[in-house]
Curated annotation (Swiss-Prot):
Source organism of this protein record: Corynebacterium glutamicum (strain ATCC 13032 / DSM 20300 / JCM 1318 / BCRC 11384 / CCUG 27702 / LMG 3730 / NBRC 12168 / NCIMB 10025 / NRRL B-2784 / 534)
Annotated positions binding ATP: 257-262
InterPro entries referenced in this protein's UniProt entry, alphabetically: AAA+_ATPase, AAA_ATPase_domain, ATPase_AAA_core, ATPase_AAA_CS, NA-bd_OB-fold, P-loop_NTPase, Prot_ATP_ID_OB_2nd, Prot_ATP_ID_OB_N
Protein name listed in UniProt: AAA ATPase forming ring-shaped complexes
Keyword Nucleotide-binding annotated: yes
UniProt-recorded Gene Ontology molecular function terms: ATP binding; ATP hydrolysis activity
Amino acid sequence: MVTMSSPTDSSPSNSFSDFNREEQSRLSDEVRQLKRTNSDLGARNAKLAEMLKSSRDKLSVLFSQLEDMAQPPSVYGTFLETAKDGSNAEIFAGGRRMRVAVSPMLCAADLMPGVQVRLGEGNQVLEACDFEQTGELATLMEMIGRDRALVSDRSGEERVVKLAGPLMDRTAKLPRPGDTLLVDRKAGYAFEAIAKTEISRLALEEAPDVSYQDIGGLDDQIELIQDAVELPFLHPEMYRAYNLHPPKGVLLYGPPGCGKTLIAKAVANSLANRIGETGTSYFINVKGPELLNKYVGETERQIRVIFERARELAGDGRPVIIFFDEMESIFRTRGSGVSSDMETTVVPQLLAELDGVEDLSNVIVVGATNREELIDPAILRPGRLDIKIRINRPNKQGAHDIFTRYINDSIPLAEPAEDLIDRAVDHLYTPRPYVRLTLIDGSVETLNYHDFVSGAMIANIVDRAKKSAIKAHIDGTGVGLTAEQLIQAIDDENQQSEDLPNTSNPDEWSRITGRQGKQVTHAEVVI
């Protein structure tokens, strides 16, 4: 007989098991949820801690900036020297000299004479900065030992200053007289030598590129100046053997535009080429009017600087040419001044340089002027400007020679160069009255256009003709320079010259032509 169990016998235990499982599942879910929540809260906490740290750092920076802003401004001064006690420093700040303490954190090697230093609240040197880069300019007159210099400002006031660190560098070359220095007058220091010296503003120390072949119609004058200038430098042993001293100076004079400056440049170029590998020649080209200065004694000082520089360059046997252009502008006859007597001190300064106590070997002075009568006679005497070479206006053959320098096969020509030159010279020297001069004895002399020909005028004529040839080439009416264009250029040059001369001073006419003779009392332009 089979016994059947009642459903009520297992129902309570099953229900409890199901409940238990459900409860465990619920609790597991809660645990997992709590773990996730805990992880999120931990991440948030870490992020908040990081943000808090960043905020504290920023706050610290802001507090530091506020403290810096509350600090008094730094004062800067110029370091002069280390005090005798070895721990303090002598500085110049605020217009007064002070002895202050030096921060122990500062390297003593950084404190060089003349350097800018930053001071703290207690006037303690905290930092060494750079050297002053702005200030006043002064000209070095002469060195006083190794660390001091005598300088002069634009007003001519002289003072002694010390040299700052860069100028005291043993590996650097000391500044020389004539150099322009950057100075602080109050601190009494010179910080830097400006590269452009006073000499370089007035002179050109390299040889020009003009040769004797570029000069036409002056063969005799070129030979004279070669004998006077080049021979002593090229054959010094011969001069010593004959106990002959080279000339100290040469004067080139004559009408304007006839090649005086060109000859001086060609001499310097020839010396440079002939010396070549054995050395270098120097050409100091001094423009007379640039030496003039309104301050008393400034012109004389500049002349001294020029000759000091020349002696320095010539110290090792190299030839140096000092070329004074427009010489009459600064070396006029003493006592001839109208509003001033500047020449009474300028002329003696040049005389002292030419034949003074200091030796002037390997240096030769070449002067150029078209008003030689204005130059002081003491300069022109033998022993100073020994050689005097007159540069006359070119004659017909000389003009032909000058034309060949400008008209040759290197430019487009419509006719042979020789034919063009012959026709141009013939037309240029055809007698055509220009001005009638009445002399003091009553005689009358008529000057023609060709009496005023110069090398500069011929160069201008050729330039005019070349411009006409270019215009004809552009228009398609012709190619190359023609004789008609040269003749037209000569006529245009003569026509434009008619109204230019000043006839109010008749005596100037004889000087313009380069003639010496009787005094002119009246001049009349022939129309």
